[in-house]
Amino acid sequence: MITTGRVWKFWDNVSTDEITPGRYNLTKDPQELARIAFIEVRPEFAEKVRRGDVVVGGKNFGIGSSRESAALALKAAGVSGIIAKSFGRIFYRNAVNLGIPLLIGDTDELEDGDVITVNWETGEVRKNGQTLQFEPLPGFLLEIVREGGILEFIRRRGDLCIG
């Protein structure tokens, strides 16, 4: 799972309401959700994000309400994964359950607009010849992401057993 894309850098404490604001959050259609992603804080995001781009956050990315639509909107927008200093715990599981790879670590070296290559399995990020190391998902969660999310994992394997 290696991707190359542009960085969309965000700040600490990005809430699920900033990702998919409640007043727009009236649908479960992924493409509609992609169109409202970050609409109030980065209105250009939905139009300019490209498949493979990477969302980068600070501390507590995805805090707030448990709306799955926040992670679903980013997946539908084509984001290849999310790197942050830390994640809101419910957002973290929603992202994994939807098959979105996550990395944790110091994101200070990554800037908005950087083009990076990410190995989501090892946590290695390359930027302008520089290699940065992040913490990848632990084994079982990485297996879920590799399968495309929890539903696909269960469909292919028949249960949630490891091995």
From Swiss-Prot:
Q: List the disulfide bonds.
A: none
Family as reported in the entry's similarity comment? Belongs to the LeuD family. LeuD type 2 subfamily.
Q: In its UniProt record, which GO terms are filed under biological process?
A: L-leucine biosynthetic process
Repressor as a keyword of this entry, yes or no, is no
GO terms, molecular function: 3-isopropylmalate dehydratase activity
List the NCBIfam families hit by this protein, alphabetically: LEUD_arch
Q: Which SUPFAM superfamilies match?
A: LeuD/IlvD-like
Reading the lineage from the top rank, the first entry is Archaea
Report the protein name in the record.
Answer: 3-isopropylmalate dehydratase small subunit 2
Which pathway?
A: Amino-acid biosynthesis; L-leucine biosynthesis; L-leucine from 3-methyl-2-oxobutanoate: step 2/4
The answer to whether UniProt assigns keyword Protein biosynthesis to this entry is no
**Catalytic activity field:** (2R,3S)-3-isopropylmalate = (2S)-2-isopropylmalate
Q: Give one Pfam family.
A: Aconitase_C
Question: What is the recorded function of this protein according to its Swiss-Prot or TrEMBL entry?
Answer: Catalyzes the isomerization between 2-isopropylmalate and 3-isopropylmalate, via the formation of 2-isopropylmaleate.
HAMAP family cross-referenced by the UniProt entry = LeuD_type2 (MF_01032)
Q: How does it assemble?
A: Heterodimer of LeuC and LeuD.
EC number annotated for this UniProt entry = 4.2.1.33
Which keywords appear in this protein's UniProt record, sorted alphabetically?
Answer: Amino-acid biosynthesis, Branched-chain amino acid biosynthesis, Leucine biosynthesis, Lyase
